[in-house]
């Protein structure tokens, strides 16, 4: 019997792929309408995404097959959804992130900030959280966590044992600082000699030798890295993929929205939200793992102990080993600043941006998008050399001159670019298009009209809690892709501004704090062996609730004037919402 269950479990992906489409067939057979056909496709993809029976990107390709065969959308129209402006913004932003990571600029920033904050417990944890959150705003959450966790463990090792300070004085390189990304599945720690040691054994031995105090500090440090990576991605439009899913869905479902979600408007709304949530997460982790002893945690009136001096020396040594800033790092820093400035000033809304002045269309709107800017800076990085131009000798062929490589080369980009996310974003946009064309969105909206009697803040909080729970066991991109079209239809049906529910639910997909499988940063810190699932769940449960409340605060305060959430927008009007005049919008929405 046990063997039978083991076989079923081993072949579960094949069984799901084979039986789920068959079990769902009664829906399109008994209800032969386009709405039912589209619902069949969406439910099938949602189940495949939740179970990961197929790779997420492969499931995202289903609309290319199902929608044309079901007569919902032409193949040529579906294909266009896979390379929209939001996808190009994601691609261009990642080009810059790959350049930052390739030339180790992110490590220099991290070490420099840690030298400033010092190594006393509370400032050290805050320093790690600030650095991780800032880097996560621009580069992938996974890459940020993979770099910061080894640094955190190296500092903790020095805090625990002052004997390691002798290695620092000799100028030896600390192998723990080497950038590594442990596999959550295999759960191993890679050493410099190429061997792999199981984390489980290291964990059991470590728990036997570590003092309870040091174990708590280690757990706190590990969680602060993965949590701040997820929180930091909230702040910018390119910080995490769900943010771009929202922008793409808004532009697809409501083409006349006037570019309401752009880099500047998103940052104005999400950055304060991120800062408040980050500070509250810092306080919560301190209370949970270190106790709320302000004087002790901040080391007020105490001299730096030998272990703390050793840990500080580790950071100093690693920062010194990076050497002075190279030409490539300086060039990338300048291009990065230019990119952010161009994003903010393109079409800010409260004054005419350079996009409106230099490249206006017939309506005076900017013809240049945030994606255009990102691609432009990305292309520049392929052109600018990584070393100051000069007569450089080829080390492999003495006597011959060799031009330096660019800041980016295609081989590096091809290796580090998460192409699967590009397809996943496209699959989400294709689903939204199919839902609109089939009439499923309109049908769902009509069924949800009774919600009009429920206060809008209550709707936003309940939906945010639902999404935050759902994303603990499902990809945040898949979660956003599934929920946003439904939420848009619901908002239209009850005469509520679509962004009033779509914004908080998008942010809620980043509140994946409870389980190691919820997000790659969680899996990375868990693989180092210092945490149990219960430790993460205990810390993440309250943080999830705090996050939902902070998002509710944001959407009902500074979010209202930023996006005019107090009234139903004209661009969200449809045939079924003709009665939703601005004056008749959901009156339970708070006024500014």
UniProtKB/Swiss-Prot annotation:
Main localization is membrane
Q: In which tissues is it expressed?
A: Expressed in kidney and intestine. In kidney expressed in the proximal tubule (at protein level).
Q: List the GO terms this entry assigns under cellular component, sorted alphabetically.
A: apical plasma membrane; extracellular exosome; membrane; plasma membrane
* Record region (Disordered): 165-185
Q: List the subcellular locations.
A: Apical cell membrane
Q: Which reaction does it catalyse?
A: succinate(out) + 3 Na(+)(out) = succinate(in) + 3 Na(+)(in); fumarate(out) + 3 Na(+)(out) = fumarate(in) + 3 Na(+)(in); 2-oxoglutarate(out) + 3 Na(+)(out) = 2-oxoglutarate(in) + 3 Na(+)(in)
Database matches in CDD domains: SLC13_permease (cd01115)
Going by the UniProt record, its keywords in alphabetical order are: Cell membrane, Ion transport, Membrane, Sodium, Sodium transport, Symport, Transmembrane, Transmembrane helix, Transport
One example GO MF annotation? succinate transmembrane transporter activity
Family matches, as Pfam families: Na_sulph_symp
Q: Where is the composition biased (Polar residues)?
A: 165-177
Biological process per Gene Ontology, one example term: alpha-ketoglutarate transport
Q: How does it sit in the membrane?
A: Multi-pass membrane protein
How is the enzymatic or functional activity of this protein modulated?
A: Li(+) decreases succinate transport in the presence of Na(+), by competing at one of the three cation binding sites.
Residues spanning the membrane: 13-33, 53-73, 86-106, 114-134, 221-241, 274-294, 324-344, 371-391, 450-470, 482-502, 511-531, 545-565
* Family statement drawn from the similarity comment of this UniProt entry: Belongs to the SLC13A/DASS transporter (TC 2.A.47) family. NADC subfamily.
**Task performed by this protein:** Low-affinity sodium-dicarboxylate cotransporter, that mediates the entry of citric acid cycle intermediates, such as succinate, citrate, fumarate and alpha-ketoglutarate (2-oxoglutarate) into the small intestine and renal proximal tubule. Transports the dicarboxylate into the cell with a probable stoichiometry of 3 Na(+) for 1 divalent dicarboxylate, rendering the process electrogenic. Citrate is transported in protonated form as a divalent anion, rather than the trivalent form which is normally found in blood. Has a critical role in renal dicarboxylate transport.
Q: What name does UniProt use for this protein?
A: Solute carrier family 13 member 2
């Amino acid at each position: 019997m046990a063997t039978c269950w083991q076989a079923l479990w081993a072949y579960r992906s094949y069984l799901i792929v084979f039986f789920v489409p068959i079990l769902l067939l009664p829906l399109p057979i008994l209800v032969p309408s386009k709405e039912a056909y589209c619902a069949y496709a969406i439910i099938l993809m949602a189940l495949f995404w939740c179970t990961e029976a197929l790779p997420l990107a492969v499931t995202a390709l289903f609309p290319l097959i199902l929608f044309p065969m079901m007569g919902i959308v032409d193949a040529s129209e579906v294909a266009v959804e896979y390379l929209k402006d939001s996808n190009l913004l994601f691609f261009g932003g990642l080009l810059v992130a790959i350049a930052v990571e390739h030339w180790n600029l992110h490590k220099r920033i991290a070490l420099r900030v840690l030298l400033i904050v010092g190594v006393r417990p509370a400032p050290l944890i805050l320093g790690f959280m600030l650095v991780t959150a800032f880097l996560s705003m621009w580069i992938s959450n996974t890459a940020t966590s993979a770099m910061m966790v080894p640094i955190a463990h190296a500092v903790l090792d020095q805090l625990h044992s002052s004997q390691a300070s002798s290695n620092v004085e000799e100028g030896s390189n600390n192998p723990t600082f080497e950038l590594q990304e442990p596999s959550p599945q295999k759960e191993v720690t890679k050493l410099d000699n190429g061997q792999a040691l199981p984390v489980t054994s290291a964990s059991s031995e470590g728990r036997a030798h570590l003092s309870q105090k040091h174990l708590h500090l280690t757990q706190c440090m590990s969680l602060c890295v993965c949590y701040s990576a997820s929180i930091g991605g909230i702040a910018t439009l390119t910080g995490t993929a769900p943010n771009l899913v929202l922008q793409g869905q808004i532009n697809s479902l409501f083409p006349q929205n006037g570019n309401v979600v752009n880099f500047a408007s998103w940052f104005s709304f999400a950055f304060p939200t991120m800062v408040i949530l980050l500070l509250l997460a810092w306080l919560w982790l301190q209370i949970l793992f270190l106790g709320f002893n302000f004087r002790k945690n901040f080391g007020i009136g105490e001299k730096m102990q030998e272990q703390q001096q050793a840990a500080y020396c580790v950071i100093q040594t690693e920062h010194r080993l990076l050497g002075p800033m190279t030409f490539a790092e300086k060039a990338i820093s300048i291009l990065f600043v230019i990119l952010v400035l161009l994003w903010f000033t393109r079409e800010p809304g409260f004054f005419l941006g350079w996009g409106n002045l230099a490249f206006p269309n017939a309506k005076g709107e900017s013809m240049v998008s945030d994606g255009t800017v990102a691609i432009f800076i990305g292309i520049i990085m392929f052109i600018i050399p990584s070393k100051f131009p000069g007569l450089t000798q080829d080390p492999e062929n003495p006597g011959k001159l060799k031009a330096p490589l660019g800041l980016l080369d295609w081989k590096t980009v091809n290796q580090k670019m998460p192409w699967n996310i590009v397809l996943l974003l496209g699959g989400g946009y294709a689903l939204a298009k199919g839902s609109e064309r089939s009439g499923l969105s309109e049908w769902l909206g009509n069924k949800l009209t009774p919600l009009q009697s429920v206060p809008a803040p209550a709707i936003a909080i309940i939906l945010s809690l639902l999404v935050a729970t759902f994303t603990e066991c499902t990809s945040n991109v898949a979660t956003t892709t599934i929920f946003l079209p439904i939420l848009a239809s619901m908002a239209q049906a009850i005469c509520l501004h679509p962004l009033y529910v779509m914004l908080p639910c998008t942010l809620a997909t980043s509140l994946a704090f409870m389980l190691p499988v919820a997000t790659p940063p969680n899996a990375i810190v868990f693989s180092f062996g210092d945490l149990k699932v219960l430790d993460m769940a205990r810390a993440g449960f309250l943080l999830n609730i705090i996050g939902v409340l902070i998002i509710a605060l944001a959407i009902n305060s500074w979010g209202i004037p930023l996006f005019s959430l107090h009234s139903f927008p004209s661009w969200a009007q449809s045939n079924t919402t003709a009665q939703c005049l601005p004056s008749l919008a959901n009156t339970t929405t708070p006024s500014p």
